[in-house]
């Protein structure tokens, strides 16, 4: 495929896509903002602990590949970054809002079921029902300039197939290692995680507001 990302590049791109929609008042992001987004403990799988230098290296690489661009100007002393991965003025990759939400969630969390994707992507796009989620996934799997996602074999004991993005190469279709979380219903767990993410976002906005008032 034309678009190939390493695991760290996928995390950076996913974070910028997410923040562009969920916290537009804080977008574009500074290096520190990208570090914080990459190392979030909510809506990230796996949870990472990247250093500023590691993130800066990814940002520099992605700028060279024209997947990001730097933004600076009057009154903007800190270099900030915005994504050009999709829906940019001169870019080839055009995605609908629903497709962006699903791709972003897959970049940030890896393989997931349609039910998990619907709950976890809700802050970026409100799917009307499961049929819309599944039809959007099928569109991404069958696009002429793709495919961008693939449906994986159903895991033992699971009701739904998982889907995975293909921006980091072919996916080894192997069941995940069983752990305690498998005992919890996937949809319910995803909803709880979505609420945790929303609380974290609200706390981040409150901290930012308090810091601004304190200046």
UniProtKB/Swiss-Prot annotation:
Aminoacyl-tRNA synthetase listed as a keyword: no
Coiled-coil regions listed: none
Superkingdom as given in the UniProt entry: Bacteria
Entry keyword set: Acetylation
GO cellular component, as recorded: cytosol
Record's keyword annotation contains Acetylation: yes
Residues where N6-acetyllysine is found: 80
InterPro entries: DUF480, WH-like_DNA-bd_sf, WH_DNA-bd_sf
Family from the record: Belongs to the UPF0502 family.
Protein name, as recorded: UPF0502 protein YceH
Organism of provenance: Escherichia coli (strain K12)
Gene that produces this protein: yceH
């Amino acid at each position: 495929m034309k678009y190939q990302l390493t695991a760290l590049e996928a995390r950076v791109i996913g974070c910028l896509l997410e923040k562009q929609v969920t916290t537009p008042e804080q977008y574009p992001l500074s290096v520190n903002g990208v570090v914080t987004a990459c190392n979030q403990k909510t809506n990230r799988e796996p949870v990472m602990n990247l250093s500023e230098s590691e993130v800066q290296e990814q940002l520099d690489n992605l700028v060279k590949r024209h997947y990001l661009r730097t933004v600076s100007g009057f009154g903007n002393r800190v270099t900030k970054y915005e994504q050009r991965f999709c829906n940019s003025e001169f870019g080839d990759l055009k995605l609908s809002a629903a497709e962006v939400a699903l791709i972003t969630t897959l970049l940030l969390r890896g393989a997931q079921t349609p039910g998990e994707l619907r709950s976890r992507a809700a802050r970026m796009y409100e799917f009307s029902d499961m049929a819309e989620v599944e039809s959007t996934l099928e569109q991404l799997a069958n696009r002429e300039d793709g495919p961008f996602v693939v449906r994986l074999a159903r895991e033992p004991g699971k009701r739904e197939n998982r889907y995975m993005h293909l921006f980091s190469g072919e996916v080894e279709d192997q069941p995940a290692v069983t752990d305690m979380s498998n005992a919890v219903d996937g949809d319910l767990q995803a909803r709880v995680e979505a609420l945790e993410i929303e609380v974290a976002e609200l706390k981040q906005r409150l901290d930012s507001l308090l810091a601004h008032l304190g200046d």
